[in-house]
Amino acid sequence: MSLQNFDPAIARLIDRERNRQETHLELIASENYVSEEVLQAQGSLLTNKYAEGYPGRRYYGGCKVVDEIENLAIERARKLFGCEYVNVQPHSGSQANQAVFLAVLEPGDRILGMSLAHGGHLTHGASVNFSGKFFQAFTYGLEKDSETLDYDQMEDLAREHRPKMIIAGASAYSRVIDFPRFRKICDEIGAYLMVDMAHYAGLIAAGVYPSPVGIADFITSTTHKTLRGPRGGLILAKAEYAAVLDKTIFPVYQGGPLMHVIAAKAVAFNEALGDEFKHYQQRVINNARTMADVLTRRGLRVVSGGTDCHMFLLDLRAMNITGKDAEALLESAHITLNKNAIPDDPQKPAITSGIRIGTPALTTRGFGEAECAEVANLIADLLEQPDNTARVENIRRRVMHLCECFPVYLLT
């Protein structure tokens, strides 16, 4: 029996979401479109299999096939990133971060991460998150004028507080991160270095963004975003930490791994090993830079003045529109992105003074620099006259046409 016949309510909602994805331009930096092959693996009967433990060391029978699948995922990830150790079992990037913390830290230990207010992530020490509740968290930020990472401040805080772990990585930072400089201060004070590369993983795999492999003690990531795989987590590390990380993921922190998701991760890693993936990631950066340049020429302020990766922030204060209102305005024209705090944002987190723009999904659709320049101009047109309903409707129609020209999936 088909899903349509058995559960028409869910089938209709899936169809509605499919239609939304096909008819909206996706600019959320943390979203992407997986391939049909990744969808097939994730939607497979592997979802039926329980496999607590690790290949060759399971607590259930019947795991010979899924052992091969997990080993293949590990092998491909090691080849992709050139690392010594890989764990593909984390269910998410946040859980990968938690696992690393639990592996080598004790409650109350000091950590140093990037401030959420300056582009960091909740799991890097925010007070509302487990990382800020169970550990004594200190945060570094950006230089006021350049809006780039303040390495001097980070080093001063490290020497003052002597954290047991320093975290490099961000969720809304558009510039290259100097991982060797983090390593140097960690060595000076005797701290672990963890790099959260969730946003940059695909770029790193393709060699278009500096790699922390061989520099950091621990590297965590999601497997979606720029890596263009299923939603899930990943841990890379030096071989000396293999035993403690394996034990922390299972049995300390998780139970059975999601074998259908691990299979989908393996497919995504295989895709990322191909030459086309490398070309794709360079196009992602080119498209982001093109959009940032166009918006700058249109009079909007790009935080830090540009981008070295797949995303950037727009400061909307001069436009007299909040990030929340801009998000809603753009969505009414079928352009999807997210409100985002700018450095030292005077607005509340639910309102914000900025928006974040990312190009992974547009690039997956086949958009090049010309199309991305047009989209940037459409965004500027909307922000300049947010109350012009006729303009909004005209832009919505143009967006719909672009979506038709560049479908996400070739539906039959």
Swiss-Prot record:
GO cellular component: cytosol
Subcellular location: Cytoplasm
Residue positions where N6-(pyridoxal phosphate)lysine is found in the record: K225
Enzyme class: transferase
Signal peptide: none
A Pfam family annotated for this UniProt entry: SHMT
Site location (Plays an important role in substrate specificity): H224
Reaction(s) catalysed by this chain's protein: (6R)-5,10-methylene-5,6,7,8-tetrahydrofolate + glycine + H2O = (6S)-5,6,7,8-tetrahydrofolate + L-serine
Any Gene Ontology biological process: tetrahydrofolate interconversion
Protein name, as recorded: Serine hydroxymethyltransferase 1
Gene: glyA1
